[in-house]
């Protein structure tokens, strides 16, 4: 018979603890190896501060672009407004003399010598007599011809004209409510042979010119015969001008809708003549 006796070995607790801790570490590494690591990104992850800086830069860039577009829109609107104002202040008609900023310039009918181009050209010539020396002869003749036609052009006359008779002669009478008394031209007075009825100026009056007034002037307006007086003037047109005093005494009515001068009943109506009718027509 074989007897086996266990050997008595001394107890070593530190070795056991080391073996246990070694086993635990190996088990932990095995568990860590079993866990799959997340896939790594190809680009490095930027820090949080860098991301906020880029967002602020993009925001600032967008705001700057928006402000630039708004400034462009304001500039376009300003230019468009200036263009509209410039177009509004332009001449509606190239011959509108009342829109031309020249001193003492009034609209005086449709005469070509009174239009802006002629007025400016005439003032340039009058202000600088040597201005035409360097111009061709044909241009000088043209400008001098315009000047001569201007000097011989007819005087503008009022628009409201009616026919009447005086001394059995036909006259063109202007209806002028802006004048208190009647007026007659010296040429018309001589043609009618009424110089004897003229009241001479007083001896103390040294003013040159024609006599002042003619009396007992019989004027036939339609069927109405009016005895009136008139002041003598140098102007040749109009030949005779009815003032406000005579118009009120006749109770005249100016009917522009029908183009007639209505006299008090039962007298007839006097039609107005065409505008700016030349003498003798």
From Swiss-Prot:
Residues 55-78 have a biased composition (Basic and acidic residues). GO terms for molecular function: aspartic-type endopeptidase activity. The keyword S-adenosyl-L-methionine does not apply. GO terms for biological process: negative regulation of transcription by RNA polymerase II; Notch signaling pathway; proteolysis. Its main location: nucleus. Keywords: Nucleus, Transcription, Transcription regulation. Residues 36-47 have a biased composition (Pro residues). Gene3D superfamilies: Acid Proteases (2.40.70.10). A motif (LXXLL motif) lies at residues 244-248. It is found in: Nucleus. GO terms for cellular component: cytoplasm; nucleus. It comes from the Eukaryota. The keyword Transcription applies. InterPro entries: NRIP_C, Peptidase_aspartic_DDI1-type, Peptidase_aspartic_dom_sf. Residues 18-85 are annotated as: Disordered. PANTHER family: ASPARTYL PROTEASE DDI-RELATED, NUCLEAR RECEPTOR-INTERACTING PROTEIN 2. Interacts with NR1F2, RARA and THRB in a ligand-dependent manner. Down-regulates transcriptional activation by nuclear receptors such as NR1F2. This is Nuclear receptor-interacting protein 2. It comes from Homo sapiens (Human). The gene is NRIP2.
